[in-house]
Regions:
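Membrane-embedded alpha-helical bundles of multi-pass transporters/translocases
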Residues: 1-502
Length: 502
């Protein structure tokens, strides 16, 4: 238990630092380029290779590779495991090069399809930036391969640190070199950052015993394909939803950039408090499933579920209560003015309703993948994509950019609830008694929201500068989280003891 706490604690700190730097990066971009045409072109271009990577490779690597690799390590030894890993890495590398070449050749067509609202110079700029950033697909694929390999070997520290390097590269560029190279240099800086993420993991992989083999085919690749195809479909919801929202938002003034600023902050907040848990738990669930340790699997899953819910409920309350001051503090400077704040804060507010569902969705997906069951997540994702398309169309007509954010939140809720029901029906990891905690956590969260909003309103006379706004917002956050924490300590002692055991 102590080792687990230390590992997850270190991962949390590193992920927190990484996400903070990621948000600092977004703050610099917002301040330098605002929420206009240049920013729209950059986000349309940068999202293309990243979304294609997510659609084709990301979850196949992180969710299909780890269970199969662990199976070979446990049953056939390290040598055979490394042969499988080498064959997998080589296959992924070749596939990512082919996808990158296709995107570079047809970049104009891709931008036209994915961001039809961009015209003239903005469209042309997006095409040029896409060509520059397309090799990110190759570096991201290799980065994910080595991160999965290291996590399977029990090395969580290096994968948790690598994003710090790439975010730092972009920040350094904006501070020191942006005045010379502008938006094109920013695209190259992002590309270099992804390359560094891959390179820094190679020494750690060697240190942890991985030995690369010149293997271009391994029988285990068939197992990966069987698991990966439905996994890919199951994880299409995030990138395809991004593409749908960008396509709709491109017809709105400052739509793409405002939606991106809001969604990235929302995803950063969620990831900080969930990724450290799910990244640690997934290899553990995979091993428990491979060893047919059903009781251990259920206990690990239930404890992880409760931790994520307990942490995200007060975060959701803070985001709902303080969405506008949060956006003002994070983004409002330079080219990012009042109108951009209004649009981004509104989108951030509606995104916030989905943060709890988004957090548990990641855990539930990985719980299915640990059992080598990817059919149910795949079917759910297909339904969710269709739902998102319909909801985005109608809600955009009613609410503009805010409707796109609400659509995303509702889709996450649909997926999380569907997967929860399906998984609990199969393994019975969550009882009615456990469900009482969820209801109580929501009640505590509502009280926290009221307290946070009340304190923020009471402190309005001191809000006369940026520094005092930060102080006002900080005090309100502490008050809201403090009340929630008191409820947990006073009324959930049994839960705290249970989590310590697991």
């Amino acid at each position: 238990m102590n080792k687990a706490i230390k590992t997850v604690g270190f991962m949390f700190i590193m992920i927190l630092l990484s996400k903070v730097l990621g948000q600092v990066r977004e703050m610099f971009i917002a301040s330098t380029f605002g929420a206009g045409g240049i920013a729209d072109a950059y986000y349309a271009a940068s999202s293309l290779p990243l979304n294609l990577f997510d659609i084709v490779f990301a979850s196949a690597i992180s969710s299909a590779f780890i269970p199969v690799y662990n199976t070979y390590i446990e049953k056939e030894g390290i040598e055979e495991g490394d042969r499988f890993a080498s064959g997998f890495i080589n296959t992924i590398f070749l596939g990512s090069v082919i996808i990158s070449a296709i995107l570079m050749i047809f970049s104009d067509l891709f931008i036209y399809i994915m961001a039809p609202g961009l015209h003239g110079d903005v469209h042309n700029l997006a095409v040029k930036l896409t060509i520059i950033m397309t090799p990110i697909i190759v570096f991201a694929s290799l980065t994910f391969c080595f991160s999965g390999l290291l996590q399977s070997k029990g090395e969580f520290n290096v994968p948790a640190v690598i994003s710090i390097i790439s975010n730092s590269a972009v920040i350094i560029y904006i501070i020191f070199f942006n005045k010379y190279f502008g938006i094109y240099g920013l695209a190259f800086a992002l590309l270099i950052g992804w390359g560094l993420q891959f390179l820094v993991q190679i020494p750690s992989a060697h240190k942890n015993g991985f030995r690369y083999k010149r293997v271009f085919y391994h029988k285990g690749l068939k197992d990966v394909v069987k698991l990966a195809l439905p996994v890919l479909v199951g994880t299409w919801i995030q990138p395809i939803s991004n593409m749908i929202n960008n396509a709709y938002a491109s017809s709105l003034d400052k739509g793409i950039s405002s939606l991106n600023y809001a969604s990235k902050l929302y995803l950063i907040v969620s990831a900080v408090f969930t990724v450290s848990v799910t990244n640690y738990v997934f290899p553990l669930l995979s091993k428990q499933s491979a060893l047919e340790d059903k009781d251990g699997y259920k206990k690990t899953l239930c404890a992880s579920f409760k931790i994520i819910v307990a942490v995200l409920v007060p975060i959701c309350a803070l985001m709902l209560a303080l969405h506008t001051p949060i956006i003002e503090i994070v983004y409002k400077r330079g080219e990012f003015g009042d109108e951009a704040v209004r649009l981004t804060a509104g989108a951030f507010y509606w995104y916030s309703f989905g943060i709890i569902f988004y957090g548990v969705l990641d855990l539930l997906n990985k719980a299915f993948y640990a059992q080598k069951n990817s059919i149910i997540p795949a079917i759910t994702a297909v339904c969710a994509i269709a739902l998102n398309f319909v909801l985005s169309y109608f809600l955009k007509s009613l609410m503009g950019i805010y409707g796109l954010a609400l659509s995303a939140a509702l889709v996450y809720a649909f997926m999380a609830i569907t997967l929860f029901i399906a998984l609990n029906k199969k393994v019975r990891f969550f009882s009615l008694k456990d469900g009482v905690f969820f209801i109580k956590a929501i009640i505590y969260g509502i009280v926290s929201l009221i307290v946070t909003k009340g304190v923020f309103t009471l402190l309005s006379p001191i809000d006369t500068s940026v520094l005092l706004k930060i102080v006002r917002t900080g005090i309100s956050c502490v008050a809201g989280v403090g009340v929630y924490g008191i409820f947990i300590i006073l009324f959930e002692r049994k839960l705290i003891k249970e989590l310590k055991k697991n």
